[in-house]
Amino acid sequence: MCLQSVIFKLLSSIEAQLHVVHEPEASTSEKDQIGWNETTVVVLSGITNLLANYLDVLSSHTTFGESWKALLAHFKSLLDFKVLDINTAVFKSLRQILSKGNVKGSDTPNFDRSSIDLAWDLWSESLPIVKSDRSDKRFDNQDYLLAYVSALPEIYRLVESDLDDGRVQRMLTLLREAIQQASAAGYTADIEYLTPLQTQVLESIKIIRTDIEGIPAALIGQVAGFTALAFEPRGPPTETQRPTYVALSKASMTLSEKLILDHSSNNNIYMSGAVSASISTLSKPIVLKYSFPTITKGTSPWRQATTSALAILKAILPVITKEELEESVMRSIWSSIVTIANGVTTAFCHHLPETVNIRDDQDFDITSFLTLRELITPALGSQVIPDKTRRAYTESLFHMSLIHQPEPQELPQINQELLATLYQPRKGRTIDPTPSLRSKMSYVCFDELVSLVALHDSSPPRIKLAQAAAPYLILRAGLTLRAYIADQPLRGRMPQPLSQRRELLYILKALVKLRCEPEAIPDTPGIDSEGKKHLHRLYPLLAKAVRAAARDQEVLECVGKALDEVGMEFGL
């Protein structure tokens, strides 16, 4: 057979010459090395075309199995030289030959199980390394890695019927290695568009069948890893050559969304931690928001993450609230959900580029938060969820509800009771703080605190949520009242700044209207109250506010209504 007598002898002679020119102690010039590398690539291309075009004839011969084994052994020997161009040629050859085998409609398969396993072994043994100088800014391994990954769909087509969890895990590991080993040279920054390699990796993942136990979870977990790449800290200066992964991250968010929605009823994706990992990863860009240094022209990563997270939560929350999942799984998922909720309401708006539209982003976040609150309330009050998770949520609502930022000393200090300084007067100020650039969101967060404390159905989850929110609502109202009591007398006949006046009136009206959950706030000694306990706690401040509001009829009227509510509970 000509394979043995001609082709394999030719490959053996080339391998022998490559050993000579790449011997560390050899005095071979770089030009000679490059020449033999190029010769090898040309020979491989010619051999590949011959084998691919005549595969049906060759595979019908009884010795084809041994010849195939020998060919792959030569491929392995060539890979051992760790030469970039040769490695690229080897995997292009493998893909081209495999693409002609076992095609649909063929009467006889070209590759039997043993031959397919040999091809799988060559591809899956490892991602073959190449000799490189990473300090060389011209180094570009994208074509090589693309050739390697492009061989997978053909291998997958042949092994699909015998696919198992182990093989899928190996595929995913090697695909991730290919993504992470890619250099950025030769490509424009992958911010708006995927590189060909990244596209091929995602397309390879999409073809993997998901009807085998454990595979959906494995895919979700791996795609979550791709999402995270853009937000991982960059290494030393030499790593600036690596891709940005921004476009990959956004595409992975969309793929994560689809995978989880398609398999939301699969218990294993929760128990394995895949869902938790996915939503935890989505929380990173949402929390970073404007702090993410890479500017995009298209949809920003935090917006895409928010959209995908909401779609995922809409699908999984009905499942996790009904399924009896392990407490550790539930707690991990809910911790990430709260992180996402807090990230949606938060934004650090200092030193922003001109391309940022704060008002438009705020409207997007408000719509997202209102959607999210409908999904998580009252489920967040479940006894399985730790109190600290609920407190993290309500504490963030408190901080984001602050329209005029107080001085640090006005807030409770570490290891101090939340309401320990509620009644302590502060020094008056004549310099008025600038209102938040996201005041509209601040009012939404305040409204949510009020809603959480309000009486609904007195169910255990509602009580838990009300208890978590009540002290923050009281503190929030107390800060505004204390500021008014301290600052207004210093203004004389000058009116209160419009933004502060609007805030004060809004809060007073909400407090008067609120009928709180009876178990949300501990009873005040000697006072029997049901729905107005929040006003009892604020009574000392309300009484002082009357004196400060002597010249402002509207404020005086609102404070008076609050005091009247307290009086009615005393029978006055």
Regions found by a protein language model. Give the residues of each.
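Extended amphipathic alpha-helical scaffold segments
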Residues: 1-572
